[in-house]
Amino acid sequence: MITTKELRNKFINYFESKNHSHQPSSSLIPFGDDTLLFTNAGMVQFKDVFLGIEKKDFSRAVTVQKCLRAGGKHNDLDNVGYTARHHTFFEMLGNFSFGDYFKKDAISFAWEFLTKEIKLPIEKLWVTIYASDDEAFDVWHKHIGLAKERIIRIDSSDNFWSMGDTGPCGPCTEIFYDHGEDVAGGLPGTPEQDGDRYIEIWNIVFMQYNRHADGSTTDLPKPSVDTGMGLERISAVLQNVHSNYEIDLFQALIKKAQQVTHAKDINSPSLKVIADHIRACAFLIADGVLPANEGRGYVLRRIIRRAIRHGNKVGAKEIFFYKLVAELVNQMGEAYSQLIDKRELIEKTLIKEEELFLKTIENGIKIFDAEIENLKDNTISGEVAFKLYDTYGFPFDLTADMAREKGLKVDEQAFLAQMQIQKQRSKEAGKFNVDYNSLINSQVKSEFRGYSTLIEDAKVLEIYQDGQLVASTSEQVPAVVVLDKTPFYAESGGQVGDKGILEGVGFEFVVEDVQKSGEAILHIGKLVKGRLNLNDELTARVSDQPRLATAANHSATHLLHKALKLVLGGHAEQKGSLVDENRLRFDFTHDKAISRSEIEQIELLVNQQIRANYPVTTIETSQQKAKSLGAEALFGEKYGDIVRVISMGDFSIELCGGTHVAYTGDIGLFKIISEGGIASGVRRIEAVTADKAIRHTFTNENKIIAIKDSLKANDANLIDKIKSMLEQIKNQEKQIAKLKKELLSGSSNDIKETNIGDIKVVVANVDGVDVKTLRDKIDDYKSKNTKVIAVLTTTNADKVQFVIGVSNAITTLIKAGDIAKELSSHIDGKGGGRADMAQGGGNNSANIDQALSQVEKFILNNIKE
């Protein structure tokens, strides 16, 4: 039996023998593609190549691509564990042609691999083609020799492939495997096609078109080929099993899942869910995603929590999910070394998330169970589903999963309506602005010269206004200029774009920002003098001081990144950065606040490298060579075949396309100004360098001097004086609180108390006290009386504050919150609370006596009723 591991290698080796360049899997996070939540196909990393935007030094490629389908259009989560072939994470075997071979060779390669390399019986194979694709039919029938009756024309989207609503697309041909007559199901295109007898194993897409947002299509620059064959699916065929979960890789994970959950039935769908989900979670974390309440982090959290619940369902009594990581590394670590490198981070993240979820799941399940007990039909309301999501962290699909197990459904539309209301509430007010620059899709190439110079003579290739090409631009009109060569750095890798001037005979264009569009560099700004035309000659000048300050901050981020790893641990991976002339911002993975001692260690390490004045060296080399040198590749960054490696002594070596200082000493000084959390498991450091670091130090020193002068202290006794002052303030606050309490007690004789039956009613205004004192007095009344209604107010200038207490024994007669609303209506205020306690305030103290009189009447009327 061929193992999954062997099959993966056999596929790569076959296509390498056909002159295909083996390219590593790209990240599950599609870089620079906002149309996709996750990488869901092998061609995603080559999308710009198919569009003609990006050039490669090879025209044939083979990959084994990590893919995820658990959000957005491509979402298989609900079916995972309950069918034979649905997964969240899967591996896609693929071979690609970029304007090289087309239909004849693509079909021939696939047929040879299936029938010669892995020796599938020809009589077991069927194919489909797009109904009008006569060229593909001729290749199958005339060149391959496949009988006409085994070639099925399909006139539907099944045989016309697209990655999404926009992007590369084209007709495809699919190869199916026949599991035999003893398995239910019919041929593709028949009513029985959804059965398991005929299984699609390979999809070959002939990339001929680019689909635009309006639905129209245009020809791609060169016809290309994109193929995909699910590794798990073809493994099942070769291992003679009908379910992907029966292949060797999944069986190992399922057995481990049974062991750690103590499940009795190894055939339980829950174990399949767990085995599938550990792959998705581990690879997402390894690719830099951490659990969160939105975006990709929320999808990860959903998958983790779904796995946890299925573990609890089959018997897990303690945290278990992280225990599968070791077996996953054993099964897939050889093919994906990131699992080995990030194993500790993966396990720690899963442990933390499971502990967090277990704290809330019990209460959530109680709410769920209580709701279904009171159901009048078989539908759980969207409001309840939203409460479970918003309060207890239950993803909608988890609630739907629990409902399905009990034969119920959830009102998804009502849930989505609640979600929309929440989004609308949190949406920032503001006018919507169209970013016309994002509409620019330039096809020209600009040569970047800015590593070695800040001044360059250049020629105008394109001018844009409102996203449209124009022949010229006039003064004060926002515009974008594309040059044949430029010293201006375009924003990327966290570094902001340069600022400066484009000047020529009779004109001056101020550059406010610089971005990229394909291989074009966009100079964004406006003309302040004269007129600028296509083909004009000009001089491009980068503002030197902002560039130098930005370079210092960028180099400092490299030193900071390394220092974080040395002080906090290897898990401290970069999650994002922002580098400009004023500061640097660095986001990284770490699960707790950094101590003052750790911050000092980090600053010392960075400043030691600055004082060492190491040369900052740059080499350009292949990705493989860079990796062998130990260069750090950063999360979310997209690299070409040739990469730029930045080294700072023996301390730091990273792949980077940004601008840097010549020597670490040019950074001057490094100072951290803030550190805090921005998401679960993600911290942020902000820091300054050079003159700004010195000024920051001066500012803090001046503050300390001012404090010393105010306290008449010196360096030796400053801390003791502050501690003494704080202790004195604390004692005085206690004394003030005591005096206020005595004041209130002394006023008790003036407080009007009445009895309505056996209920004591207290309504009074007391000046000179605070809300805490009022609360304490209310508690005193309630502790001494089994049936009491107490309304106490205090005024300060125009302001009114109040506290209301009602004994629990009489909250069925009247509620504190209702009294608060009544009082608020008379003092231009607002307030509320529980049935037994409420508080609030208002802005009209002038008629407080009249307001309290109305409250007395309100209480009397409600009690009598």
Swiss-Prot record:
GO terms for molecular function: alanine-tRNA ligase activity; aminoacyl-tRNA deacylase activity; ATP binding; tRNA binding; zinc ion binding. Signal peptide: none annotated. Its main location: cytoplasm. It catalyses: tRNA(Ala) + L-alanine + ATP = L-alanyl-tRNA(Ala) + AMP + diphosphate. Its EC number is 6.1.1.7. Disulfide bonds: none annotated. Zn(2+) binds at H554, H558, C656, H660. Binds 1 zinc ion per subunit. PANTHER family: ALANINE--TRNA LIGASE, CYTOPLASMIC, ALANYL-TRNA SYNTHETASE. Consists of three domains; the N-terminal catalytic domain, the editing domain and the C-terminal C-Ala domain. The editing domain removes incorrectly charged amino acids, while the C-Ala domain, along with tRNA(Ala), serves as a bridge to cooperatively bring together the editing and aminoacylation centers thus stimulating deacylation of misacylated tRNAs. HAMAP family: Ala_tRNA_synth_B. This is Alanine--tRNA ligase.
